[in-house]
């Protein structure tokens, strides 16, 4: 089973892999890092005008890192009713990157709401988002060593308390 979007992407020669559907019927697609920027532009033009959320996680110790995007297609002035309520079209995109070369194109210039979310993913997991205008730590001090949410992260035994002036 494929969603309308997945069929449309295949029809237009856009390589992706379906990872299935969640409990709400939202399809998850895997996109290669080198294809992500062009696919993101296509999705925006297709009508996915709202980045609901972006997050990242460490798949396994020593394994891949994943950047996850939840996109919504909101059509203003158009009402699609399912089960008595408006149902916008949604898709989940997963972009996997290797731990040694964890670079993924930023979608900041497509969806401005990716700004802080991509920065948090960088800060916690070390995923570098190419062409992000302000890619720097957002939660941890700039002097922090390592990426705290990686499964192979070794927590330091001592934390220096810094004065907030």
From Swiss-Prot:
It is found in: Plastid, Chloroplast thylakoid membrane. One of its GO terms (biological process) is photosynthesis, light reaction. It is a peripheral membrane protein. It catalyses: a plastoquinone + NADH + (n+1) H(+)(in) = a plastoquinol + NAD(+) + n H(+)(out); a plastoquinone + NADPH + (n+1) H(+)(in) = a plastoquinol + NADP(+) + n H(+)(out). GO terms for molecular function: NADH dehydrogenase (ubiquinone) activity; quinone binding. Keywords: Chloroplast, Membrane, NAD, NADP, Plastid, Plastoquinone, Quinone, Thylakoid, Translocase, Transport. It comes from the Eukaryota. It holds the Pfam family Complex1_30kDa. GO terms for cellular component: chloroplast thylakoid membrane. Its EC number is 7.1.1.-. SUPFAM superfamilies: Nqo5-like. NDH is composed of at least 16 different subunits, 5 of which are encoded in the nucleus. NDH shuttles electrons from NAD(P)H:plastoquinone, via FMN and iron-sulfur (Fe-S) centers, to quinones in the photosynthetic chain and possibly in a chloroplast respiratory chain. The immediate electron acceptor for the enzyme in this species is believed to be plastoquinone. Couples the redox reaction to proton translocation, and thus conserves the redox energy in a proton gradient. Its main location: plastid. The keyword NAD applies. It comes from Ipomoea purpurea. This is NAD(P)H-quinone oxidoreductase subunit J, chloroplastic. The keyword Glycoprotein does not apply. The gene is ndhJ. InterPro entries: NADH_DH_suC, NADH_quin_OxRdtase_su_C/D-like, NADH_UbQ_OxRdtase_30kDa_su, NADH_UbQ_OxRdtase_CS. Belongs to the complex I 30 kDa subunit family. HAMAP family: NDH1_NuoC.
């Amino acid at each position: 089973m494929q969603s309308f979007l997945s069929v449309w992407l295949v029809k237009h020669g856009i390589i992706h892999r379906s990872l299935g559907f969640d409990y709400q019927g939202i399809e998850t697609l895997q996109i290669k890092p080198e294809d992500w920027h062009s696919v993101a532009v296509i999705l925006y033009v297709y009508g996915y005008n709202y980045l609901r959320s972006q997050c990242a996680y460490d798949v396994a110790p020593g394994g891949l890192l994943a950047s996850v995007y939840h996109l919504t297609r909101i059509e203003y002035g158009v009402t699609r009713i399912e089960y008595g309520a408006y149902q916008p079209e949604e898709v989940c995109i997963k972009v996997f990157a290797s731990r040694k070369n964890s670079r993924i194109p930023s979608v900041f210039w497509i969806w401005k709401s990716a700004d802080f979310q991509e920065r948090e993913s960088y800060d916690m997991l070390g995923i570098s988002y190419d062409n992000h205008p302000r890619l720097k730590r957002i939660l941890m001090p700039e002097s922090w060593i390592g990426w705290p949410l990686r499964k192979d992260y070794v927590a330091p035994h001592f934390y220096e308390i810094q004065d907030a002036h």
